């Protein structure tokens, strides 16, 4: 089966841009303390590009690869603690969850091989257990004919820099009871609609507390849980599922969480994928875009 027959092609424009620009030296790389989160059809159209997409700068390709590596660390940790099978290839990572978690595919390179694309197409085509998400941080794979719908989200990074102290109580979570509180906040507040109604331990198994590099934070307002997030340290740090419960929004919970995250991860660059609602906060604290990912679902 060819790549076109599989319903997946590589888009030359974005991938070429990544190949042609020489990598910029990353000023923080010298720091010694970094520690390790349908049916096949022909496709010829280019992947969707948002009209307001920022141009990439020199060095963004290297930083985007680091962000992608962190996402691979996240999904590996989740898969192994949830006991979901993982397919690992140089060009992609696939997690085969249950009927609620679904199939998750993460492209790990801007230049997946023809074999990678054919295998991804087969995974998508044969999946019958629930939802499907294919995350392409590089925006170079075209799944237009795969039966999936695309959306674009910016991938951002922030170099190490001072940050104000959080204005609210934000504490790390290190026991199963408080982890369950974080899990409820994220599932209901983010929300993780696929994992509703809430089932204890489904999103965040207690085994994640023993996973190196994985950390949970809980924000409280007057002693009541108000927000939460998950971080992963690999070559860089990644922030995931930063959530404020609806009844506590517009009260500085998200900013307090982010201040706490950046303070805890001081000395390490921090990456995230930004929602439209969260983008102004990230911009205000020095995050900058390094790519525009395409998520297919």
Residue ranges and their predicted role:
Residues 134-139, 246, 270-281, 296-297:
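Conserved beta-strand-loop-alpha-helix junction that forms the acyl-donor binding cleft
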Residues 175-189:
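A short, well-structured alpha-helix characteristic of acyl/acetyltransferase catalytic modules
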Residues 38, 108-177, 293-297:
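Acyl-donor-binding surface of acyltransferase catalytic domains
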Residues 28, 32-128, 197, 210:
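N-terminal charged segments
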Residues 116-121, 244-246, 250-263:
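Conserved acetyl-CoA-binding loop-helix of GNAT-fold acetyltransferases
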Residues 197-245:
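A conserved beta-strand-loop-helix scaffold within acyl/acetyltransferase catalytic domains
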Residues 139-150, 255, 276-293:
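Conserved active-site alpha-helix within GNAT-family acetyltransferase domains
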């Amino acid at each position: 089966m060819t790549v076109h027959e599989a319903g997946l092609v590589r888009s030359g424009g974005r991938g070429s841009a990544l190949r042609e620009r020489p990598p910029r030296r990353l000023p923080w790389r010298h720091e010694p303390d970094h520690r390790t989160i349908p049916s096949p059809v022909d496709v010829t159209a280019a992947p969707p590009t948002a009209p307001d997409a920022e141009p990439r700068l020199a060095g963004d390709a290297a930083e985007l690869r680091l962000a992608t590596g962190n996402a691979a660390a996240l999904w590996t940790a989740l898969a192994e603690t949830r006991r979901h099978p993982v397919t690992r290839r140089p060009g992609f990572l696939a997690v085969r969850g249950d009927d609620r978690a679904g199939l998750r595919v993460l492209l790990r390179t801007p230049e997946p091989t023809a074999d990678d694309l054919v295998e991804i197409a087969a995974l998508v085509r044969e999946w019958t257990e629930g939802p499907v998400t294919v995350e392409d941080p590089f925006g170079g794979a075209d799944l237009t004919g795969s039966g999936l719908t695309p959306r674009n989200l910016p991938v951002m990074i922030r170099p190490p820099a001072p940050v104000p102290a959080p204005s609210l109580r934000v504490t790390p979570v290190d026991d199963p009871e408080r982890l369950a509180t974080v899990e409820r906040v994220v599932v209901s507040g983010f929300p993780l609609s696929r994992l509703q109604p809430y089932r204890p331990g489904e999103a965040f198994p207690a085994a994640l507390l023993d996973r190196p590099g994985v950390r949970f934070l809980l924000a409280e307002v007057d002693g009541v849980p108000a927000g939460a997030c998950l971080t992963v340290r690999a070559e860089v740090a990644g922030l995931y599922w930063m959530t404020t419960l609806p009844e506590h929004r517009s009260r500085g919970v998200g900013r307090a969480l982010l201040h706490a995250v950046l303070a805890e991860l001081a000395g390490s660059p921090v990456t995230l994928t930004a929602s439209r609602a969260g983008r102004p906060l990230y911009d205000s604290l020095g995050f900058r875009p390094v790519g525009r990912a395409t998520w297919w679902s």
